[in-house]
Amino acid sequence: MIAITHPIKQMINSQYGFLSSMLDRFPSLLNEWIKKQEEEVEQLAREYAEGDYEVYRDTYNSEISRVDSCYDEELLFNQAMLIMVYSYYESTLLRLSKEVQVDSPRPSLIANKFNATLDDELIRISEFVFNKVEPLRDQLCHNNSGTLFEKNKERAEASINFLLQKKYISVYEGRITSINRDFIKKVLDGEHKLLLKLAEICGYKTILYGYKDGLDSMVPLKSW
């Protein structure tokens, strides 16, 4: 027996797996690197001080500042991940809409093409990404220089304030400074679930082929 997955469904799963792995692995990799750097700084300070505590302290404090700046990289990483997670969703919807020839890459329109409807959970995911995640992405990409809400003010302000209240993001002096990693993962998981359902509605499935009694060639046995 052999299982063959439609290329679009395979793309949805492989890109999800890649993004999910990045989210899961980066914090531990960063912490390992920071720990190693801290150990090297301490060793350097001890060697340079030769027993003089004040020299050790000054050297350590001077060198450790470059390690502390690495925590800023995690903030930038999470911002970049949010942008990539949204792009994964947006580009896949565009691909699906072109494949099935609908005018707009909206999940409901893609489903309606096949006389199908999305359940309440998937509708909520679609609306959340459109109403909350997309404005956040737009702010990060186009307007995160201390002038929050300047573009598309009404929608952006409502969305950002909602995310602030939920503690999904932090804002300082008009700039989005941090995004909760668990929030990004939750968005990614929801997008993946919705995209897989749309792929199923479009007929993009995994098909299991195998032999049946009396047949010399493989035939479809089941799909999912």
Spans of model-derived segments:
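Flexible secondary-structure boundary motifs
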Residues: 76-185, 218-222
